[in-house]
Every structure is written in structure tokens, then in C-alpha cells.
């Protein structure tokens, strides 16, 4: 190294030290009790130096650098380093104590901070120089070699123990004295001499005089050296590990200029003990010199571990190299994860490393295993490297480490998870791109990846040109595999797909040893060409499959058709049409195969391929027909005007694929029938028949192509007419019931182009016509008797099949069951519960918010996983008891569950979905969830968006028509179940799932409310009530608050006693101990406690008023008191709402007839409202309504005074005259004159009844009542309990009262306790798409009528909250 380079190295080291000082060593330095720069004592004296500082301290002194001695004596000297008491500013203190000092103790004494590497005088260290004067031994240096190099001057280290001596430097030929200029003396370092003065010296020695005695130092042998050191290395290069007791050998080698001299110095732990030995070596090479120093320590111990530093110095350059020596007490193996137990890679990676953190000595043997199988090849114990990662690389890798000599063994396992980008397998195989129109097609995507793709997304786009690109790795793939660069892809749904979608399902399937995701898109009707793609994604990639879904009317895109379709007859015109899809094929050609060329010389048949068809066939001239506008196919027609036997043979149509350029062929064999003259296989024979018998004559013909067979009677052409039948291509003549005039000569004539053949026979008729008439009478009589017995047997059979009490089906609403023979509680015990059909696991039911709660029950919104037998999650409502419910309440809820099961499903009734009855949890009844809440609140919210005649979407109109047509179809089919409409509506929606899963066409909160909607709601409620009435179930609380609105404008009847407290509901008025919905109750229910289907019809009329007033409360402003009840009984009614059309007004008026028998049945209401809904004509109704509205204030409001006896139908009228509708009062186009009670006339037209009084025209007498919590109503008026008692006693017979329903009468003794049943209804609100619930319930008291369903005393009924 050049001198300039050495200078730069020194500057760099100085800057590094200053940088370290600036960065962290600006601190308070330690202080010594000896403040002098040098300190002089005499030999044999003791030396004590104390050092204090802010950090732990350590001492070094001559011959003991960096040796830590704490509180003990050295083996050679009597020096001691121990702790002393510090101060508050410098809490750490160390004292160095030397007893019996000698001259060799002369030198520099350093105190420094122990744990700070940088030793900077005045910053992290403090020192002083101590002279131990020995007048007998003033020189203390040892014999040494002095390397003389090219420096200007150098120090001769003649160290002295006495400062201030006069020193002379002598060589073999000269002596030098310090002159203060070129030759300098320093008591601490020796004498500095110019280098040129020493080049001729062989040795050097210092001389001094003390007293009268001369003293000489030890000799310095002078050695002239080279100037430059090249490199230094310490072997082993890495850290060295040993066990206690082993031998340490370190080799420090320097490469230097030829004939250079180097001084080695080792620095290592335990240097003071001088246990190490180092041996210098020198090897001269031709161009340089290698100098080494080998350090050896036998029987290493824990004290020998640490850094070992080798320093080489030639006087100009100083090289250092270090290594770390680790000494272990005993053999060990330690291994742990470096990046965790699970590592991930992706298939296709070039390599992956499985690293471990390993520490072991001695180095153990090792082996890598994969899934318990040894991994071959050379590997590293610190990391296993895998190249070209594939899915097969995944597994559990284990590193086994062992040291047999020490009996050590360790294992560690790592799991490698190889993520595989998803891949769709159908892309590997060719798939059809042509699909027949109106066919059912299934598109499949089977994907595999790691992790497994959770779902498959389907998209479609219209069949329009789209730019494509080819994937680089699949350049030769056909065009259909290129991915379109289009942005107009749409997600496939079952509603807005261009082709009707039957189903879209995805599932996991075990295929070829792997779990694969399979998705099938089933297209119900292929109508329109489109492009489909399926997309699968996981966390490391995605894959897509493009499907060109081209729809054509040609099967497989290529076909041959012939006219005529059967084998042609000689002489006929034949046309062979080759039809090919333009999108797929081009270059249509006709060939006729040459029979002579289809065999080789030996007569063996040749292999016929479409590619070489031209070698065996003759091309034919054909006509390419012009395609119709919009057609996507081409037709090449081969016409043969008059086919002959020689035209028989194979005809081939050849087409060429547009993309692959491959040729495809279809072959048609044309068979020609030779024309021959017709012949009869049997001649006609003469016949003798009786009058009224049947006659049959046959004219069987043999021979091909018989174009004409004609029959003659008495030379007159015989044609097919009543009683005469010609069949089997006119080969058979039949005459039913022969008459005398049918006698005569019959001729059969058969002709074709080759000629004609005839056959004739005579027919004679005998007997009289009267005999035939008698036979007719006998036949008719026999038929009548047979029909009579058939009807009788049918009635007997139906009576035997009448369901027993154990088979009673009833509603789950606020129903009354007939306890005439068996009490309700016993009936419920007879009902069974099929757990295999209805039990639903609780763990798949996630309960949500409480929709409503009452005194002992609550209704909760919940998510049910798989309740529709699929994998979807559906929102349901769950009824359950509150904590602390009694056993009777539990039995009541269980009884209601059984009733719900036996009543069955209906589209317009909230239906049961399942139940949780197992004893490991609460009893829960699961019913449908209706997202739009009750109808009353919905109508109120939609008032602002009411648009009577807004145009409905085609989908909504289709649903409306389906409802009406389904109801009429069920009516026409005797015995059809009410489930039919429910199922048919769901199928119309394109789904076969249960009612809760009907997909809604649009959000009802966003669409306007129309007059058509109001009629539709009314029709559906009537339909649901018809269903309940057919089950002999009475609702008793039919109101808009108990009608729920679901998706797709479907309304459902409900009544939720479990979740309502009617004691807090203003619509219920207290009557004695019961609360009653008086505004909705019929007069016979208020006064006589009679509840029948006819009383439900009255409530339906009030419900109509609510609907057409958009959710208003009935009888607005009317006080609900005794006067109200009396006037209601006397015939006063509500005025119709302004939105009600004349037809709706008449329906209301009929429902509010005072005579229950005069009210229409629900089946009549269904037909009337269905015709009204189906007929349309809303603008005409509006004009009629406006015209009526102008005169409503003084004339008919649609609600006139109707006496309970205003309608008179005599027995004669009832027997003689068919029922007819008063079409002058009801619009015929809506009603079609369908009759129902209350608007019938027999024979003659009955004049209209007198005008009905309304509450608006005749205000009630003002009465002030103090409102209380017991009897408040929504109008703010109440009817006191005492008034009810008075009103009831006033109209009750003295001994008993009569409860009449249609055709029934029941006398109940006075004082008979009223059976009570729980009553409940939901109160819901919806605003902004949310549903709010205010559910309450209570109790009512009522007797029941014969033939209808009534609960026994104490029976409790429950229904769903909001459903």
C-alpha cells in the first residue's frame, strides 16, 4: 500500500471516530483521583487509582489490556480491581490497587466505560502514565526486532522506568544523542531517529548513566523491510465453534511485498493468562512474501469465547482481521421456524425456500422428508430449496437432525401450501357453438383451484361484433377461445336474461380425486344468440371461459331435408334441400356418389371421407335460394323434376367450416318407388242388413301410389256426411244406423296413373223403422238409470270419505274451530306433528331483531339457512314464547303449530315454513317474512305517490292476469285444491320454490300506487278468505292491519295474537272483560256475539273502505258508543271513500247488508273482483265515479238506507226464476251479471231500496266521555262498559238468544259463560323501505254458531308476528 493510501486510511478512521462521538458519545467522561498526566512512584510502593463515572467501568494497565478482573487477585501480581463507593453524579466507581510495584508496571493506566466500544480519551475514557522508578533497572524493554522501512523517521522503543534520563542510542559503528531537531527523546515512547541513519545498523541499544553506573537496554535487531502489505486473512474465515476441552487453532496470514517484515499482534479473551501460543512462519515466493502467525490454545474453556483479532504491522501499514470463537459447554441441537409453520407458494413459481433457524454443534447429520418420504438430492439443513413449483409440491416437509455420538435428535415440520390459479376444464375440450332454437340447453363450467373458488360468476352480452385478442400461450386456439375486449358484459340473472333462465346453480363435487366447483346455467328456451362467459376467481388468479351461444333453427347448424319426406314415387318432383348456418358454414355443394368407384379392383369397399368425397362423386348443379330478410342460413336446393328409378342413390351435401376450413358432409339416400297399376286384394260382396244396424264395406287396395279411391251408390258419387264415414284413405265405408233408403248398388273405384280397378256389391235393408225407435227408448232409459245409480254411488263414496276429527284442517289465523262434537283442545291433541317434514335445526337459525312482543310472546326476525332445501339464506319470522311462559301457553303455541300444518298453504295466507320443537331449546314456529309490513301502514305511506292510472309494467300485468285466470281455472275444475294457484303463481315466476322465495319484480316503495293495485289487493284478500271459508274457518278480525304485503304485490292474511297486546290498541274497545274491534264487527256480532263467515264478509266491506281510503281509519269522527251501535243496527252506514268506483261502492253496500244471508259469499266476491281486475276500463270508471261524486252529497252515495228486510224473494220466485244480476246497478262488464245475495231478483226486477242513511249526513248526538286506558279508540271516543251491558241486555231475549248463520240456529241459555279465545293482530308501519312493528294482543269473549269453528273455553290461539 502506498503512503498516500495509508494516510487516507488514517483520516478515514479519525472521521469515523469523530462521527461516532457526534452520534452518541457526547457524555461526561470518567474521572481519576490522580489528575496529573504522569505519576511517579518508586519500586515496591503500592499504587491506588480510583475511577468514577456515570456508567459501569473497567480498567486496563501495562500487560493487561482489556482484561476484566473483578474483586480478585491476579496470579502473578498483587494488583486488585474492586468496586468502590460512587457519588450522586458518578454512581459507578472502580479502584485499581497495585501492591509491591516494580519497574515493569511502568506504563499507561486506562479507565473506560465497560459497555461502550469506542474508547475516546476525555469522552469515554480517562488515563494517566505511571513511572515506577527502579534505579537498578532503568530500562524495561524486551529484546525485539526493529523493522526499518521507507518512512522518514521511526521510533526506537527504549522504554524507561525513570523519567528525565540522558539517553544515548548506539549501534555497532555510531552513537546518536538527542539534538531536539532530527533526533528526539520521549520518556514514554523512546527515541525518534531519521530512517537513513539506521539503514547501515545491524543492531541498536540505548545507554544511560545513573550515578556512577552505566546501564544498557536490551538489543533491537535491525531488519530492513519492504513497504507494502497486500492482504490479510484469518482462518477459519467464519466464526469458529468448539466444545470445552477442544483445541483452538487460528492462522493469520499476510501477503506482503517481497522481503517485507511484519510484526503480528494478537488480541483475544484470556490474553493475560498467556495460555495461547503463536508461532510465526515465513514463506518467500517469487513475487511476494507470505507471513503467518498461528495461534493455538489447548483445552479451551468458556473463558476463551469471544472475538479474536490479528493485527499485522510493518511500521507503515497496519492490517487487522478478526473472527468470533464460540465455545459450547456440551453438544446441542436447536431448530425452530424462521417464517412460521405454514408457507405459501404459487404454482409456476421458479423456486421456493423452506427456511429454518438452526443452531447446533457439532454439525448434525440431517435429512429432509416430504410426506414421510425422503427428499433426494443435495440440500442444506438451513433451507430446502424447491424449483419449478407445482401443485404436487404441496405437502408437509420435515427436517430430521441427529447427533449419534451425543444421542441428540430433533425434528421440525413445515407445511407448504401451493396456491393454484383457478382453471376451467371445459376450455380444454371443444364445445358446440351452435344451438337449436327453442331447445333447452345447459352450459357448464367446472373449475379447480387452490384455494377452491367459492363461486362462479356468469355474464352475458348481446351477439354483436367485439374485438378479440388471442392468449399468447394458446395462439392456435380457435376464435371462440379469444376473450372479447368488451365492457358491456352483464351479470346473468333469472329475471332480465336475454334467454329465459330455468336455473343457475353452483356446488362442490368430487371429480377425479379433487374437489371442484361446478356451475350449471340451464337455459330454458334458446331464443336469441348471445355470448356467455363464466368467471372463477381465487386469491391468486382467475380464469374465464367464453361461450359463443349461437341459436339457429337448423339442427346442428347443417341438415338435409327432402320433399316429399317419404320415399318418392316414380314421376314425382323431388327437391333435396341442404340447409347450413351462415355463421358456421360456407361453400355448399351437392354430389352424387358413383357406385362404381366406391369399391376397389378386388371389390372391397373404400373408406369414404368427406375430405375426398370429390374423388368418388359427381358434382351436381343446384340452386342457391335467396334467404329471407333476417335469415341466418343458406339453402342449396337440388331439384329433380320427374324422378325415375335410375335417380335412386346416395346424394351428399358438402359444406366448409368458416373458421377451421374443415369440410363436413351429410348423406341422403334417395329411394324411388316404381309406379304400378292398382289392384284390389278383396272384392265387395252383397249384404243384407236390418234397419238401424251398422254397415261396413271395405275396398282393400295393393300397389304403390293410389291417388284416388271413390265410392258410388247407384252411380251417384258418395261423399262423407252425417252417418256416413269414409276412413283408411277411403278404403273403408261405414254407415251408422242403416235406413231403408241406404239400400242400393255400391261401387268402389280405385285409380292411379297406370289405370283403374273397380268392385261393386248390392246392399238390401229389411225391417221396420218403429223397431229402431223402440230400441232408442230402451237405450235412453237404460242410460238414465245407470247415471242415477252412478250419482248415488258417488254421493255415498264422498260421504264415506268425509274427514274425521283427527283429520280436521284449520287455519292458523284468528280462527274458530267447530267444537260441536269434540272440544278444540281435544282436536289439537288428535292432530299430529311430523318432525321429519317440519323440524328445522336451531343451529341453522340466526335470530335477529325483535319485530314485536306482547304479554307472553314475541316475534323475531331471523335468517334461516337452507330452509328451502337449498343452500341459500332466507329471511323468516320466528314466533316464540317469552321467558317464564307457563305450560298452558306452551301447549297453546304447540296446538297452533299443528293447526298451521293441517290447514295447508295458500298464496294469500302467511304460511308455515318450519318449527323447532326439540327439548334442547325454546319452542319456535317459523313462518314467512313479509318485508313491506301491513297493508294499512303501506297505504298511508304511499298516499303521496298515488297515481290512479299509472301504466303498470308487463310483468305486473302478467301477474294480475295469472291470479285471476288461475282462480277461475280452479273454479272450473271440481276438486282442484287452493294450492293450485299458489303453485301456479310460483311456476309463473320461473321457480319451483316455496312462497317466501318468490322473487320480486321491483321495489314496491319505488313504484307508484295505482287504482289497479287497490283492486288487486281486494281480490287477493277475498281469495284468501275464500280459502279460509272453505276450511270452515272464521277470522273475526279481518282488517287492513291484519293484511301483510309481500314481494310482487302479494298480500297475505294474518293475525298475530302472540305478538300483540290489544289492551294498548286503540282499535279495540272494551266490552266487559273483553276488547273488541267494533268498527269492523257486524251488528249480529256486536249484539248477539254471533261470528260466522257472513260476519267476516261485513269486515271485508270495512276492509275495502280502508283500502280505497288509502289506509284511513273507518268511521272518521264518529264516537264509538251505544248510539253508534244502535244506529249501525238501524241501517246507518259509512259514506264511500272518494276513490271508490260505483262497482266498489255496490260491493261495500252488499257486504254491509243487515241480513247476514243477503251478504255475498267470498266465492262471489272473488269472481266479481276478478272480473273487475281483468276487465280494465279504469278511465270509464273514473268518469262514472266523478259523475256520481257530483251528486253524492244529496243523492245516492253508494251507501243507502238498507233495511234488513228490504229484499224479498218469494218461494215461487226462488223455484221458477233463475237468478239474475241487476245489471242496471252494477257495471255488467265487471260483473257479467254474476249473482250474489243482496243484489238478486227472481223473475222480475226488484226496485232499488230506499236511500241509505250515512253517519256523515246524520251526525250523532254529542256525548262527552272521559277517555281511559280501558276503552279508548283511535277516534278518541270510547264506549263505557256499563253502556255495553245496557245495550246488550236491551237486545237479548229473556231466556236465550238466537245465533243464526246460513241455515243454522242455536239457542244458548242466558248466563252461559262465554268461551274466550285470545285475539291478536299486528300493527306495522313501513317507511322508506323499512318495516316498523307495533304488535299487540288481547282477549275477546264470544259464543259460536253451529257448523262453524269455535274454540272451547280457555282455548288460546296464536299466530305469527307480522306474518
Swiss-Prot record:
Residues 25-775 are extracellular. Residues 1307-1317 have a biased composition (Basic and acidic residues). Disulfide bonds join 51-111, 158-206, 252-310, 445-534, 466-486, 578-653, 699-751. This is Vascular endothelial growth factor receptor 3. Keywords: Angiogenesis, ATP-binding, Cell membrane, Cytoplasm, Disulfide bond, Glycoprotein, Immunoglobulin domain, Kinase, Membrane, Nucleotide-binding, Nucleus, Phosphoprotein, Receptor, Repeat, Signal, Transferase, Transmembrane, Transmembrane helix, Tyrosine-protein kinase. Residues 1288-1330 are annotated as: Disordered. CDD domains: Ig, IgI_VEGFR. One of its GO terms (cellular component) is nucleus. One of its GO terms (molecular function) is ATP binding. Glycans are attached at residues 33, 104, 166, 251, 299, 411, 515, 527, 582, 594, 683, 690, 758. The lineage of its organism: Eukaryota, Metazoa, Chordata, Craniata, Vertebrata. Its EC number is 2.7.10.1. The chain crosses the membrane at residues 776-796. Disruption phenotype: Embryonic lethality at about 13 dpc, due to failure of remodeling of the yolk sac capillary network and defects in remodeling and maturation of primary vascular networks. It is a single-pass type I membrane protein. It comes from Mus musculus (Mouse). Present in an inactive conformation in the absence of bound ligand. Binding of VEGFC or VEGFD leads to dimerization and activation by autophosphorylation on tyrosine residues. The modification Phosphotyrosine is found at residues 830, 833, 1063, 1068, 1230-1231, 1265, 1333, 1337, 1363. Residues 797-1363 are cytoplasmic.
Amino acid at each position: 500500500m502506498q503512503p498516500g493510501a495509508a494516510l487516507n486510511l488514517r483520516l478515514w478512521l479519525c472521521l469515523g471516530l469523530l462521527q461516532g462521538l457526534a452520534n452518541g458519545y457526547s457524555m461526561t467522561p470518567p474521572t481519576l483521583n490522580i489528575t496529573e498526566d504522569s505519576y511517579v512512584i518508586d519500586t515496591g510502593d503500592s499504587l491506588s487509582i480510583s475511577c468514577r463515572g456515570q456508567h459501569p467501568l473497567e480498567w486496563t494497565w501495562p500487560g493487561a489490556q482489556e482484561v476484566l478482573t473483578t474483586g480478585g487477585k491476579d496470579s502473578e501480581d498483587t494488583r486488585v480491581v474492586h468496586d468502590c463507593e460512587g457519588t450522586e453524579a458518578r454512581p459507578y466507581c472502580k479502584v485499581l490497587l497495585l501492591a509491591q510495584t516494580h519497574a515493569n508496571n511502568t506504563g499507561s493506566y486506562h479507565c473506560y466505560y465497560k459497555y461502550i466500544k469506542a474508547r475516546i480519551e476525555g469522552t469515554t475514557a480517562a488515563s494517566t502514565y505511571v513511572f515506577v522508578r527502579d534505579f537498578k533497572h532503568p530500562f524495561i524493554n524486551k529484546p525485539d526486532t526493529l523493522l526499518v522501512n521507507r518512512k522518514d523517521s521511526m521510533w526506537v522503543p527504549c522504554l524507561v522506568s525513570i523519567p528525565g534520563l540522558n539517553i544515548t542510542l548506539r549501534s555497532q559503528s555510531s552513537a546518536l544523542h538527542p539534538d531536539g531537531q532530527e533526533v528526539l527523546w520521549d520518556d514514554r515512547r523512546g527515541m525518534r531517529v531519521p530512517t537513513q541513519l539506521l539503514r547501515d545498523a545491524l543492531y541498536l541499544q540505548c545507554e544511560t548513566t545513573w550515578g556512577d553506573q552505566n546501564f544498557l537496554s536490551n538489543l533491537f535487531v535491525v531488519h530492513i523491510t519492504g513497504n507494502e502489505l497486500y492482504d490479510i486473512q484469518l482462518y477459519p474465515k467464519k466464526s469458529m465453534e468448539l466444545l470445552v476441552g477442544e483445541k483452538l487453532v487460528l492462522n493469520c496470514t499476510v501477503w506482503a511485498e517481497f522481503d517485507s517484515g511484519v510484526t503480528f499482534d494478537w488480541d483475544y479473551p484470556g490474553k493475560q493468562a498467556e495460555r495461547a501460543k503463536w508461532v510465526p512462519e515465513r514463506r518467500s515466493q517469487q513475487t511476494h512474501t507470505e507471513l503467518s502467525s498461528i495461534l493455538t490454545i489447548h483445552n479451551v474453556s468458556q473463558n476463551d469465547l469471544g472475538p479474536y483479532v490479528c493485527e499485522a504491522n510493518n511500521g507503515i501499514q497496519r492490517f487487522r482481521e478478526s473472527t468470533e470463537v464460540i465455545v459450547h459447554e456440551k453438544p446441542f441441537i436447536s431448530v425452530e421456524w424462521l417464517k412460521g409453520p405454514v408457507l405459501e407458494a404459487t404454482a409456476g413459481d421458479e423456486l421456493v425456500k423452506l427456511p429454518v433457524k438452526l443452531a447446533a454443534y457439532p454439525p448434525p447429520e440431517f435429512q429432509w422428508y416430504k410426506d414421510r418420504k425422503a427428499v433426494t438430492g443435495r440440500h442444506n439443513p438451513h433451507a430446502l430449496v424447491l424449483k419449478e413449483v407445482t401443485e404436487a409440491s404441496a405437502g408437509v416437509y420435515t427436517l430430521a437432525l441427529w447427533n449419534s455420538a451425543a444421542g441428540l435428535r430433533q425434528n421440525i415440520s413445515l407445511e407448504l401450501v401451493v396456491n393454484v390459479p383457478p382453471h376451467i376444464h371445459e376450455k380444454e375440450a371443444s364445445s358446440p357453438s351452435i344451438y337449436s332454437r327453442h331447445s333447452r340447453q345447459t352450459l357448464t363450467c367446472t373449475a379447480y383451484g387452490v384455494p377452491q373458488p367459492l363461486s362462479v360468476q356468469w355474464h352475458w352480452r348481446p351477439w354483436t361484433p367485439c374485438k378479440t385478442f388471442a392468449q399468447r400461450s394458446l395462439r392456435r386456439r380457435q376464435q371462440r377461445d379469444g376473450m372479447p375486449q368488451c365492457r358491456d358484459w352483464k351479470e346473468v340473472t333469472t329475471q332480465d336474461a336475454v334467454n329465459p333462465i330455468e336455473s343457475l346453480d353452483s356446488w362442490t363435487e368430487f371429480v377425479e380425486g379433487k374437489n371442484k366447483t361446478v356451475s350449471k346455467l340451464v337455459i330454458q328456451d334458446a331464443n336469441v344468440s348471445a355470448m356467455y362467459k363464466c368467471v372463477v376467481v381465487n386469491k391468486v388468479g382467475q380464469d374465464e371461459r367464453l361461450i359463443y351461444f349461437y341459436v339457429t333453427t337448423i339442427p346442428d347448424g347443417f341438415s338435409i331435408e327432402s320433399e316429399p319426406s317419404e320415399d318418392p314415387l316414380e314421376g314425382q318432383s323431388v327437391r333435396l334441400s341442404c340447409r347450413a348456418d351462415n355463421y358456421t358454414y360456407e361453400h355448399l355443394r351437392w354430389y352424387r356418389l358413383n357406385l362404381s368407384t366406391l369399391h376397389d379392383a378386388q371389390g372391397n369397399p373404400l373408406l369414404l371421407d368427406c375430405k375426398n368425397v370429390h374423388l368418388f362423386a359427381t358434382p351436381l348443379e343446384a340452386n342457391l335460394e335467396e334467404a329471407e330478410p333476417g335469415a341466418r342460413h343458406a339453402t342449396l336446393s337440388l331439384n329433380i323434376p320427374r324422378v325415375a328409378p335410375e335417380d335412386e342413390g346416395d346424394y351428399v351435401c358438402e359444406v366448409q367450416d368458416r373458421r377451421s376450413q374443415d369440410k363436413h358432409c351429410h348423406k341422403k339416400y334417395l329411394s324411388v318407388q316404381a309406379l304400378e297399376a292398382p289392384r284390389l286384394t278383396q272384392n265387395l260382396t252383397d249384404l243384407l242388413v236390418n234397419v238401424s244396424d251398422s254397415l261396413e264395406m271395405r275396398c282393400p287396395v295393393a300397389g304403390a301410389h293410389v291417388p284416388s279411391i271413390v265410392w258410388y251408390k247407384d252411380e251417384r258419387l258418395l261423399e262423407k256426411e252425417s252417418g256416413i264415414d269414409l276412413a283408411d284413405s277411403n278404403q273403408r265405408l261405414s254407415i251408422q244406423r242403416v235406413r231403408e233408403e241406404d239400400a242400393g248398388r255400391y261401387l268402389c273405384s280405385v285409380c292411379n296413373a297406370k289405370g283403374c280397378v273397380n268392385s261393386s256389391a248390392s246392399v238390401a235393408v229389411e225391417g221396420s223403422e218403429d223397431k229402431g225407435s223402440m230400441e232408442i227408448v230402451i237405450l235412453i232409459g237404460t242410460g238414465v238409470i245407470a247415471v242415477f245409480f252412478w250419482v248415488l254411488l258417488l254421493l255415498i263414496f264422498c260421504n264415506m270419505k268425509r274427514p274425521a276429527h283427527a283429520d280436521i284442517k284449520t287455519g292458523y289465523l284468528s280462527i274458530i274451530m267447530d267444537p260441536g262434537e269434540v272440544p278444540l283442545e281435544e282436536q289439537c291433541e288428535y292432530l299430529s306433528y311430523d318432525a321429519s317434514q317440519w323440524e328445522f335445526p336451531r343451529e341453522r337459525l340466526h335470530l335477529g331483531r325483535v319485530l314485536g312482543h306482547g304479554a307472553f310472546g314475541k316475534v323475531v326476525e331471523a335468517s334461516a339457512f337452507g330452509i328451502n332445501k337449498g343452500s341459500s339464506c332466507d329471511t323468516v319470522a320466528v314466533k316464540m314464547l317469552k321467558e317464564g311462559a307457563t305450560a298452558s301457553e306452551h301447549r297453546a303455541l304447540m296446538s297452533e303449530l299443528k293447526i298451521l300444518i293441517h290447514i295447508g298453504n295458500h298464496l294469500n295466507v302467511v304460511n308455515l315454513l318450519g318449527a323447532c320443537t326439540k327439548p334442547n331449546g325454546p319452542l319456535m314456529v317459523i313462518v314467512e317474512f313479509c318485508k313491506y309490513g301491513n297493508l294499512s301502514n303501506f297505504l298511508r305511506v304511499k298516499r303521496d305517490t298515488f297515481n290512479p292510472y299509472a301504466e303498470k309494467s308487463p310483468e305486473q300485468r302478467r301477474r294480475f292476469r295469472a291470479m285471476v285466470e288461475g282462480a277461475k281455472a280452479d273454479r272450473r275444475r271440481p276438486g282442484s285444491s287452493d294450492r293450485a294457484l299458489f303453485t301456479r303463481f310460483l311456476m309463473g315466476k320461473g321457480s319451483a320454490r316455496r312462497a317466501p322465495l318468490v322473487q320480486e319484480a321491483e321495489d314496491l316503495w319505488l313504484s307508484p300506487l295505482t287504482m289497479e293495485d287497490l283492486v288487486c289487493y281486494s281480490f287477493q284478500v277475498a281469495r284468501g278468505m275464500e280459502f279460509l271459508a272453505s276450511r270452515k274457518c272464521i277470522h273475526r278480525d279481518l282488517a287492513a292491519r291484519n293484511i301483510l304485503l309481500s314481494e310482487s304485490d302479494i298480500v297475505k292474511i294474518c293475525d298475530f295474537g302472540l305478538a300483540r297486546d290489544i289492551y294498548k290498541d286503540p282499535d279495540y274497545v272494551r266490552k266487559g272483560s273483553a276488547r273488541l274491534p267494533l268498527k269492523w264487527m257486524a251488528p249480529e256480532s256486536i249484539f248477539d256475539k254471533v261470528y260466522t263467515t257472513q260476519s267476516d264478509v261485513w269486515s271485508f266491506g270495512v276492509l275495502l273502505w280502508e283500502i280505497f281510503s288509502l289506509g284511513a281509519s273507518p268511521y272518521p269522527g264518529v264516537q264509538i258508543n251505544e248510539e253508534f251501535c244502535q244506529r249501525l243496527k238501524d241501517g246507518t252506514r259509512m259514506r264511500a271513500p272518494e276513490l271508490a268506483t260505483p262497482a266498489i261502492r255496490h260491493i261495500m253496500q252488499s257486504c254491509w247488508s243487515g241480513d247476514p244471508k243477503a251478504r255475498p259469499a267470498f266465492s262471489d266476491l272473488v269472481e266479481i273482483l276478478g272480473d273487475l281486475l281483468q276487465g280494465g276500463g279504469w278511465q270509464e270508471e273514473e268518469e262514472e265515479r266523478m259523475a256520481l261524486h257530483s251528486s253524492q252529497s244529496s243523492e245516492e252515495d253508494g251507501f243507502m238506507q238498507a233495511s234488513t228486510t228490504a229484499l224479498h224473494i218469494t218461494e215461487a220466485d226462488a223455484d221458477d226464476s233463475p237468478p239474475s244480476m241487476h245489471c242496471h246497478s252494477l257495471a255488467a262488464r265487471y260483473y257479467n251479471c254474476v249473482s250474489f245475495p243482496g243484489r238478486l231478483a227472481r223473475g222480475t226486477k226488484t226496485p232499488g231500496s230506499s236511500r241509505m242513511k250515512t253517519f256523515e249526513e246524520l251526525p250523532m248526538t254529542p256525548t262527552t266521555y272521559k277517555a281511559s286506558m280501558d276503552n279508548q279508540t283511535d277516534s278518541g271516543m270510547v264506549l263505557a262498559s256499563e253502556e255495553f251491558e245496557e245495550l246488550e241486555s236491551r237486545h237479548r231475549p229473556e231466556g236465550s238468544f238466537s245465533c243464526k248463520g246460513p241455515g243454522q240456529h242455536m239457542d244458548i241459555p242466558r248466563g252461559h259463560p262465554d268461551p274466550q279465545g285470545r285475539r291478536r293482530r299486528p300493527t306495522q308501519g313501513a317507511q322508506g323501505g323499512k318495516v316498523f312493528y307495533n304488535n299487540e294482543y288481547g282477549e275477546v269473549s264470544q259464543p259460536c254458531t253451529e257448523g262453524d269453528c269455535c274454540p272451547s273455553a280457555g282455548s288460546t290461539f296464536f299466530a305469527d308476528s307480522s306474518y
